[in-house]
Amino acid sequence: MVFDPRTLDQPKDISAYRDQRYQGSVRDQELALRTSCTLYVGNLSYYTKEDQVYELFGRAGDVRRVIMGLDRFKKTPCGFCFVEYYTREDAELALQNISNTRMDDRVIRADWDAGFVEGRQYGRGKHGGQVRDEYRKDYDPERGGYNRAIAQKSMVE
């Protein structure tokens, strides 16, 4: 398939993940996704360490850096990270072979990211973590138990 930048006016299926706060047009974001060497990795355990991510994703190629997602208030891990590779080819290999595998007994999700920008390592949820975790109703010990809103409500009752 040949890449044609003229086809970037509408979002395509290159990535299910979209940064809702991306500073630029849909076309700019789509171009960034198609040329990026960065992956967004989600559904990590809060206990997953940076060196574990390096070890797993390093199997696909040379990792430039790993940026662990942090709770905006506590500055503790909150279940996601960004993995930057030196080449698009290594990132593609990781996406094909590592996404939907297990790390710390969790199935991790990886998807293209338009590129890390300082500040994106912090969770955007109301309580500082990921928004996705605020809607979780089940108990998940690897991601802090119940979501914080449910935990606070049950403490009041």
Curated annotation (Swiss-Prot):
SUPFAM superfamilies: RNA-binding domain, RBD. Residues 37-115 form the RRM domain. SMART domains: RRM. MRNA binds at residues 17, 40, 109-113, 120-124, 130-131. It is found in: Nucleus. InterPro entries: NCBP2, NCBP2_RRM, Nucleotide-bd_a/b_plait_sf, RBD_domain_sf, RRM_dom. Belongs to the RRM NCBP2 family. Component of the cap-binding complex (CBC), which binds co-transcriptionally to the 5' cap of pre-mRNAs and is involved in various processes such as pre-mRNA splicing and RNA-mediated gene silencing (RNAi). The CBC complex is involved in miRNA-mediated RNA interference and is required for primary microRNAs (miRNAs) processing. In the CBC complex, ncbp-2 recognizes and binds capped RNAs (m7GpppG-capped RNA) but requires ncbp-1 to stabilize the movement of its N-terminal loop and lock the CBC into a high affinity cap-binding state with the cap structure. This is Nuclear cap-binding protein subunit 2.
